[in-house]
Structures are given as C-alpha cells and as structure tokens.
Amino acid sequence: MFTQSIPECYSCKQPITEICLTAFGLQWHPHHIGCNVCGKDFSDGSRCEEGPDGFAYCSKDLLDKFAPKCQKCKQAIIGQTTNAVGKTYHPEHFQCETCNMVLTGNFYHTDDGTPFCEKHYYEKIGFLCRHCDKPIISGKCITVGTTRFHPEHFFCQFCKSNLSGVGYKKQGDKCYCNECFLKLYG
C-alpha cells in the first residue's frame, strides 16, 4: 500500500495542503518565509532565492546585496562584467572619462584609476603634439614652455622649416626661425 505524506511547514510545523515552497532543503508555507531585506513573503508565487549567506531573498534584493556593482552607474551587473584598474563595470559603461568612448582592448588611466582613451590620457598628462593633436609616445618631443611637439612637427610658423636642433624665437605662442623672426618683428 502506497501512502503519500503531507509535508510539514518548517516554520509553523503545520501540514502544507496547498502551495509548498521548498527552500534550503526544507518545506514552507509561502507566507512563512520572507526576504531577509524587505520582508516580502513568497505567497504571490515570486521566486525565493538563497543568498551566499544562507538567507532567503527576493530576486531584486539578492542582486542589490550580492551582485557586483558598476562603478559608473552604481547598478547591479547581471552577466558579463569588465574589470579594470580594480573596478567593475558593465562593459558598455567602461568609457573614457572625457569623450565617453567605450574602451575595449588597450586603454590608459591616470594614477587615480580614472579610465581614458589613448588621446585623452596623453592630453591629461600633457603629451599631445600641438600641431597634429596626436599622442607623443616615441619618447622624443620638443617642449616649448608647456607646449609639446613631435620633432617633425616643430617648424617655423612662417616658412615652415623644421626647427628641431636649430635656434628659434618665440612671439606669443608661435615659434619662428631666426631669419623669419627678424623679417617679421625686426
């Protein structure tokens, strides 16, 4: 003879004759187990989740409490993450701080961990060529005050001859070969 036993609620020890919720290897009336954060019970059929700490959570509170948070939007990350400079991001939120370009592959950052694309990183540290607006990464550059140039882009503003390794004069923020400077400013 086959007999079917009626489960007993772990909380109230009464028989469960209708909906039985199994959580943590135990049977419950849905209204006798609730989310550890908001207290919501699961009598409406919503999902009961077990957190890594062994407590019951509704899906929202489980994510809010345990899912990694995006450094940019502060929301829980479900699925793929981008981890960089000790921080976690939604892949689409790992962006250059200046231009918001999504960063994939190579990226650059400053000492405080702020992500920048190559151009804006070199701009931030002062290594963009004034002429071409591209990063100076070869290690060779000409510095005039706080302005930097690739050696091949450091030329007289009037005759366009290269000024690398030769004397030059400055008028305002422009550089001239000695000959053109004398012609223009006597």
Swiss-Prot record:
Keyword terms: LIM domain, Metal-binding, Repeat, Zinc
Top-rank lineage group of the source organism: Eukaryota
CDD domains membership: LIM4_Paxillin_like
SUPFAM superfamilies tied to this protein: Glucocorticoid receptor-like (DNA-binding domain) (SSF57716)
SMART domains membership: LIM
GO molecular function annotation: metal ion binding
PANTHER family tied to this protein: LEUPAXIN, PDZ AND LIM DOMAIN PROTEIN ZASP
Name the UniProt record assigns to this protein: LIM domain-containing protein DDB_G0271356
Organism: Dictyostelium discoideum (Social amoeba)
Taxon lineage: Eukaryota, Amoebozoa, Evosea, Eumycetozoa, Dictyostelia
